[in-house]
C-alpha cells in the first residue's frame, strides 16, 4: 500500500512539473487546444487508474509519455481528423521572428509522416528526450529508434525539397 501511495505521489508531481510538455506533445498530434487538453486529461485518468503497475518509479515520466502518445494516436484513429493549419495554430507553434513559411512547411512535412516516425521526431526534437528514453516510451529497441529517426529525417528532407521545387 505504501509503494502505491509513493508512486501515485510521484506521478502527480511529474504531471504537475511537466504539464506544459505533456500538453505541447498532445497538441503536436491534434493541432487543437481542446482536443489536446482532452488527451492529456484522458492520459492522466488512465495513468492514475493503473499507477500500481509501475515497476520502477524512477521511470514514471517515460511511462506517462507512453500513455500520452498512445492516447493521442488512439484519438486520431477514432477521429480520423484532417488537420488544417489555421492562423491560431501557426502563431502558437511559431516562435518570435522565425520565417513562418519555413515553419509551416516543416510542420506540414512532420504531419505527413507515419505515426511511428512522427512520434520519434516529436519526442527527440520537441521534447528533447534521449534515444534511450524514446525507446522506453515506444517500447522499441534503441537501434530501431535510431533507424526510424534517420528515416524520418530523410522523409522530411525529401518532402521539404519537393515543396521547395514546386
Curated annotation (Swiss-Prot):
<dbReference type="InterPro" id="IPR013249">
    <property type="entry name" value="RNA_pol_sigma70_r4_t2"/>
</dbReference>
<dbReference type="InterPro" id="IPR000838">
    <property type="entry name" value="RNA_pol_sigma70_ECF_CS"/>
</dbReference>
<comment type="function">
    <text>Sigma factors are initiation factors that promote the attachment of RNA polymerase to specific initiation sites and are then released. Positively regulates the expression of proteins involved in stress responses against bacitracin, paraquat and tellurite.</text>
</comment>
<keyword id="KW-0805">Transcription regulation</keyword>
<dbReference type="GO" id="GO:0006352">
    <property type="term" value="P:DNA-templated transcription initiation"/>
</dbReference>
<keyword id="KW-0238">DNA-binding</keyword>
<comment type="subunit">
    <text>Interacts with RsiV.</text>
</comment>
<keyword id="KW-0010">Activator</keyword>
<keyword id="KW-0804">Transcription</keyword>
<feature type="DNA-binding region" description="H-T-H motif">
    <location>
        <begin position="131"/>
        <end position="150"/>
    </location>
</feature>
<dbReference type="GO" id="GO:0016987">
    <property type="term" value="F:sigma factor activity"/>
</dbReference>
<dbReference type="InterPro" id="IPR036388">
    <property type="entry name" value="WH-like_DNA-bd_sf"/>
</dbReference>
<dbReference type="InterPro" id="IPR013325">
    <property type="entry name" value="RNA_pol_sigma_r2"/>
</dbReference>
<feature type="short sequence motif" description="Polymerase core binding">
    <location>
        <begin position="38"/>
        <end position="51"/>
    </location>
</feature>
<dbReference type="InterPro" id="IPR007627">
    <property type="entry name" value="RNA_pol_sigma70_r2"/>
</dbReference>
<dbReference type="Pfam" id="PF08281">
    <property type="entry name" value="Sigma70_r4_2"/>
</dbReference>
<dbReference type="GO" id="GO:0006355">
    <property type="term" value="P:regulation of DNA-templated transcription"/>
</dbReference>
<comment type="similarity">
    <text>Belongs to the sigma-70 factor family. ECF subfamily.</text>
</comment>
<protein>
    <recommendedName>
        <fullName>RNA polymerase sigma factor SigV</fullName>
    </recommendedName>
</protein>
<dbReference type="Pfam" id="PF04542">
    <property type="entry name" value="Sigma70_r2"/>
</dbReference>
<dbReference type="GO" id="GO:0003677">
    <property type="term" value="F:DNA binding"/>
</dbReference>
<dbReference type="GO" id="GO:0006950">
    <property type="term" value="P:response to stress"/>
</dbReference>
<dbReference type="InterPro" id="IPR039425">
    <property type="entry name" value="RNA_pol_sigma-70-like"/>
</dbReference>
<keyword id="KW-0731">Sigma factor</keyword>
<dbReference type="InterPro" id="IPR014284">
    <property type="entry name" value="RNA_pol_sigma-70_dom"/>
</dbReference>
<dbReference type="InterPro" id="IPR013324">
    <property type="entry name" value="RNA_pol_sigma_r3/r4-like"/>
</dbReference>
Amino acid at each position: 500500500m505504501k509503494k502505491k501511495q509513493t508512486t501515485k505521489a510521484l506521478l502527480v508531481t511529474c504531471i504537475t512539473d511537466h504539464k506544459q510538455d505533456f500538453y505541447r506533445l498532445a497538441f503536436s498530434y491534434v493541432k487543437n487546444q481542446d482536443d489536446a487538453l482532452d488527451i492529456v486529461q484522458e492520459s492522466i485518468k488512465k495513468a492514475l487508474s493503473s499507477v500500481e503497475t509501475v515497476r520502477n518509479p524512477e521511470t514514471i515520466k517515460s511511462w506517462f509519455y507512453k500513455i500520452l502518445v498512445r492516447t493521442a494516436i488512439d484519438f486520431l484513429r477514432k477521429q480520423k481528423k484532417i488537420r488544417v493549419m489555421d492562423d491560431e495554430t501557426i502563431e502558437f507553434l511559431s516562435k518570435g521572428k522565425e520565417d513562418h513559411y519555413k515553419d509551416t512547411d516543416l510542420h506540414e512535412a512532420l504531419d505527413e509522416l507515419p505515426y511511428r516516425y512522427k512520434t520519434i521526431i516529436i519526442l527527440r526534437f520537441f521534447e528533447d528526450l534521449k534515444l534511450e528514453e524514446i525507446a522506453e516510451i515506444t517500447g522499441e529497441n534503441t537501434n530501431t529508434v535510431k533507424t526510424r529517426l534517420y528515416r524520418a529525417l530523410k522523409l522530411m528532407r525529401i518532402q521539404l525539397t519537393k515543396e521547395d521545387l514546386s
